[in-house]
């Protein structure tokens, strides 16, 4: 969203087409999130995290190399798929093996990452007038993170002993199973939590997608400044 005011003119599409990309990413995220339980039991939280980070890194690099709207839409599919599983897998892993304060730190790190992205994009637009460079810079960071996660894979099995081995794929068939959605819907308070999370996600995604465009087209702020200002929202929720 932070780069869209600079992107849409190059693609020759209406400003509203950002919504198409967002919906494709959201659809992929929902699908991979719903499948995350089964995938994590089969592969383990560490491998799911590594694959997801690598997938999003490749997709971001693809964004940075693309100059076609429809190609961006195509690349948005693996980006969404990679973004969904990692959230569910990491949250579940931390909830099982760490204290609640560690969950807060996990979400804090997400907020920092989400805040840094628009700032990097703003700098790329300001210095190079090139949104593509911003995506490439972010993809390079993701690639480094991929290597870090891959190197740390042996550590995932050390936390929690046998309990962790089950969550990381070993002996999963004996100790864990994927919970069907119909069972999840029977959990007391689950529907209220889903509704609250839906409302939060709607606000977060709408603001993240359109904040930069609003600042450019309504407030007349330069694109590079608006891209950086979009980070303030994520800083606020962090």
Q: Which residues does each predicted region cover?
A:
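Short hydrophobic/alpha-helical segments at membrane-entry points of transmembrane helices
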Residues: 68-76, 192-193
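Extracytoplasmic gate region of multi-pass secondary transporters
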Residues: 1-4, 188-231, 235-238
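Small-residue (Gly/Pro/Ala) motifs that create kinks and tight helix-helix packing interfaces
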Residues: 4, 36, 113-126, 212
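Cytoplasmic helix-loop-helix junction between adjacent transmembrane helices
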Residues: 75-111
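Residue-level signature of mid-helix packing/kink "hotspots" within the transmembrane helices
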Residues: 25-34, 115, 234-238
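Conserved MFS/SLC helix-loop-helix module at the cytosolic interface between two early adjacent transmembrane helices
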Residues: 31-70
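Juxtamembrane intracellular "pre-TM" segments in multi-pass secondary transporters
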Residues: 156, 160-194
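Symmetry-related core transmembrane helices of the 12-TM Major Facilitator Superfamily/SLC fold
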Residues: 133-154
